[in-house]
């Protein structure tokens, strides 16, 4: 077997194992397998691995590491727009976690304007924007209730 075939088989094995870890919510184990896969984002597998790595860090509560992965992904050259868009949605979630609703909304609105693929990204963006609006309304109601007490 050639060296390149062995490398591809190893990557596929890591990918399958990482997906199994993610399904079982074993994010720490998934990080180990996703890290080497996420170095090459020009392929669909590598781009998904980069997103899943950032998402795994987010699930582990490592918000800074999740943000670093997303930001590095935005600097890498990839044609895998779906996984890049998913990463930017994750960046909005990171900002929500930090209670920076304004920035989260700006990421989502920019993505809504600029993303043109026919897939589930636009519906995810709409769901997130609706949820942000509901959060904003609930905060306003709470502030009014506190002011009247």
Segments the model singles out, each with a brief description of its role:
Residues 1-149:
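Acidic, polar-rich low-complexity tracts and alpha-helical solenoid repeat scaffolds
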């Amino acid at each position: 077997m050639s060296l390149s075939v062995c490398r591809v088989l190893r990557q596929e094995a890591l990918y399958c194992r990482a997906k199994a870890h993610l399904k079982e919510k074993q994010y720490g184990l998934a990080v180990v397998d996703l890290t080497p896969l996420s170095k090459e984002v020009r392929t669909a597998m590598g781009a998904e691995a980069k997103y899943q790595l950032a998402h795994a860090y987010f699930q582990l509560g490592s918000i800074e590491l999740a943000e670093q992965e997303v930001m590095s992904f935005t600097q890498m050259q990839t044609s895998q727009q779906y996984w890049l868009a998913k990463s930017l949605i994750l960046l909005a979630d990171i900002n929500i976690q930090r209670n920076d609703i304004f920035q989260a909304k700006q990421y989502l609105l920019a993505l809504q304007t600029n993303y043109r693929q026919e897939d589930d990204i636009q519906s995810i963006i709409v769901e997130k924007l609706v949820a942000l609006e509901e959060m904003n309304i609930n905060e306003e109601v709470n502030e009014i209730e506190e002011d009247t007490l």
